Regions:
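Conserved N-terminal beta1-alpha1 strand-loop-helix module at the mouth
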Residues: 1-91, 108-109, 156, 167-168, ...
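Structural detector of well-ordered beta-strand residues that form the stable sheet scaffold
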Residues: 19, 70-72, 93-94, 114, ...
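Residue-level detector of anion-binding/catalytic polar loops
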Residues: 43, 91, 112, 132, ...
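Short secondary-structure boundary segments
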Residues: 49, 75, 96-98, 117-119, ...
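Catalytic cores of alpha/beta
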Residues: 78-88, 121-129, 146, 165-181
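Hydrophobic, well-structured mid-protein blocks that either form specific transmembrane helices
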Residues: 80-122, 126
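Glycine-rich phosphate-binding active-site loops on the catalytic face of alpha/beta enzymes
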Residues: 92, 96-105, 135-144, 176-200
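CoA-thioester-processing core
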Residues: 113, 143-154, 161
């Protein structure tokens, strides 16, 4: 089911091929590192829903970037978290695993829905639950070989590899069938060192664009 938010989130993810995972970034550092990411070519910004300020941070970045970025929520465990993220303007909702009720609610709310999977059974459950993109998590281990073996059997949904992805192995995940990768500190390093973050982001974006 198409929606403007879902379509925008999928477009950003397909075009940039990287989702930045912003896990518990201190308040004073969130906007600066988000600015560097978006300026550097990474528009998909995931705020993990594992700290008190998460929903407010989603709203903050949605207001700051508008349609210049795709701001969503990750580490989503409950229907209530999905609903609060949607109300804050989130364009996508990432789950660590397959929670059928939460995934279905996310899809119903018009957010791009990305449940975490690692087995064929989980993949099939995720698809039935409304998954738009299958988050291969953790991705390394088992590594890109697993994805290359499984992805051809589930061509009706794209994969994003997250967890253990680095600038050195991300191309292998693209070659294995992932449309995108999710990366946290392996993408930008120390969020307080913006100069180094720019260099690291540029290196990852170069790999994504060349793959």
């Amino acid at each position: 089911m198409s929606s403007p938010r879902r379509d925008h989130a999928l477009q950003c993810l397909r075009e940039d091929r990287i989702m930045a995972v912003l896990r518990q970034i201190p308040e004073e550092h969130l906007v600066p590192i988000a600015d560097v990411l978006v300026a550097g070519g990474v528009r998909s910004l995931e705020i993990t829903h594992d700290y008190e300020r998460a929903t407010a941070d989603v709203a903050l970045l949605v207001e700051r970037f508008g349609d210049k970025a795709s701001v969503g929520v990750g580490t989503t465990w409950t229907v209530e978290q999905a609903e609060s993220a949607s109300a804050a303007g989130a364009t996508f909702c990432v789950l660590p695993g397959v929670d059928v009720e939460t995934a279905r609610r996310s899809a119903d709310l018009g957010m791009l829905t990305l449940p975490g999977v690692q087995t064929p059974a989980e993949i099939q459950t995720a698809i039935k639950s409304g998954a738009d993109v299958l988050k291969f998590f953790p991705a390394n281990p088992p590594g890109p070989t697993w994805l290359a073996q499984v992805a051809p059997a589930y061509q009706q949904r794209p994969f994003m590899a997250t967890g253990g992805v680095t600038v050195d192995n991300m191309a292998a995940f693209f070659d294995a069938g992932a449309i995108a990768v999710g990366m946290a500190d392996t993408l930008f390093g120390d969020f307080a060192d913006l100069s180094r973050a720019r260099e690291m982001i540029a290196a990852a974006v170069d790999v994504a664009r060349a793959s």
